[in-house]
UniProtKB/Swiss-Prot annotation:
Self-association state and partner proteins as the record states: Homodimer. Homomultimer.
Name of the protein: Capsid protein
Gene3D superfamilies attached to this UniProt entry: 2.60.120.20, 2.60.40.4030
Region annotation S domain, virion shell: where it falls in the sequence: 95-256
């Protein structure tokens, strides 16, 4: 039988329902329907039993096409409470298992298709415990071991915007961490593992784990598929405004084995400017990539798009340099030190980055650089207390 729903919970409704079995005159039933409008959901016709109950009169009955299975209603005042989670350690013979949840990034709205908040680096969110961009806390544990495997992994989107926000938020997982980023919505719809929702709706992407042991991040690896468990991507489109849609969290259960000497939390960067904008030597933790360092136009700009506090030392082989500025997603902590001698300048400072990419300004920049030939830089993750420069 098609489901019949009365619109208004009026006293006349209850009275009519109680009187229907007792009424002998169909005309009185029809009169009751005149004051009790009905809506049939699902767009289906009434069954014979329903017609016999309601009589021949049907002028006050309307048919509406209801929401299809899986549809989500826009909430009016519903929010999610996100409590802190203590990491759980489970020890077994030869390995240790960690269960935890971490914050990844805030999702920014965009009218056109934008992937990873506009960060164009391939493999930014590589699924590897040593990847600081995806596992801010876990990276400190991962550097103590040589191999890992995920037994549970899922990405959760928690909205912070209202139900009037427009657009879509897509969560994606690509098994190949070296695949290029999707450039259109057709590419997004082709992913085997994806989840798409409105910006005001919660969303979860469950990643299928294969129970395979892999090596930690190795900067010398030719094929990253041997060390990475794919890559995570997120995309937004058809949105408006500048307020973040929501936050992304990663929930995981990961096992480590084969302890090794501590790998460190330092990134080393070296570029001969006379060669090109790419092809630089980068070792250690992937706080930055080639594209994040701009050395053209007489200025140097560096983008650190991973949240955290960092101690930075940059050495510039140049005749002279201009001031150090922070106009992007970072701010200076304390003061900076500057030393110039024999055609080279060294700057040391501490910065705090929000991790949200800024398409207009770099995290920090050095202006008016004359006759630049080489850029060397070390970036160390730290805390303001241990890296503060008075």
């Amino acid at each position: 039988m098609a489901m019949v729903k009365r619109i208004n919970n009026l006293p006349t409704v209850k009275l009519a329902k109680q009187a229907l079995p007792l009424l002998a005159n169909p005309k009185l039933v029809n009169k009751a329907i005149d004051v009790v409008p009905l809506v049939v959901q699902g767009g289906r016709k009434l069954s014979k039993a329903a017609k016999r109950l309601l009589g021949a009169y049907g002028g006050n009955i309307s048919y509406t096409e209801g929401a299809k299975p899986g549809a989500i209603s826009a909430p009016v005042a519903i929010s999610r409470r996100v409590a802190g989670m203590k990491p759980r350690f489970v020890r077994s013979e030869g390995s240790v298992k960690i269960v935890h949840r971490e914050f990844i990034a805030s999702v920014l709205p965009s009218s056109d298709l934008t992937v990873n908040n506009g960060d164009v680096n391939i493999g930014k969110y590589r699924v590897n415990p040593s990847n600081n961009a995806l596992f801010t806390w876990l990276q400190g544990q991962a550097q103590l071991y040589d191999m890992y495997r995920f037994t549970r992994l899922r990405i959760t989107y928690i909205p912070t915007t209202g139900s009037t926000s427009t657009g879509r938020v897509s969560l994606l997982w690509d098994r190949d961490s070296q695949d290029p980023l999707p450039i259109d919505r057709a590419a997004i719809s082709s992913y085997a593992h994806s989840a798409d929702s409105a910006p005001w709706a919660e969303n979860v992407l469950v990643v299928p784990c294969d129970n395979t042991w892999r090596y930690m991040n190795d900067t010398n690896a030719v094929d990253r598929k041997l060390v990475d468990f794919g890559q995570f991507l997120f995309a937004t489109y058809s949105g408006a405004g500048s307020t973040a849609h929501g936050d992304l969290y990663v929930e995981y259960a990961v096992e480590f084995k084969d302890p090794q000497p501590i790998a460190g939390m330092v990134c080393m960067f070296d570029r001969l400017v006379s060669l090109s904008e790419v092809g630089s030597t980068i070792k250690g933790v992937n706080y930055i990539a080639d594209r994040d360092v701009i050395t053209t136009g007489g200025n140097i700009g560096v983008n650190i798009n991973i949240p955290g506090t960092y101690l930075v030392t940059i050495v510039l082989n140049a005749t002279s340099i201009g001031p150090l500025t922070f106009t992007g997603n970072s701010k200076l902590v304390g003061n900076s030190l500057n030393l110039t001698s024999s055609g080279a300048s060294a700057l040391t400072f501490t910065l705090n980055s929000t991790g949200v990419p800024n398409s207009s300004d770099s995290s920090f920049s050095v202006g008016t650089v004359v006759a630049l030939t080489r850029v060397r830089m070390t970036i160390t993750r730290c805390s303001p207390e241990t890296a503060y420069l008075a």
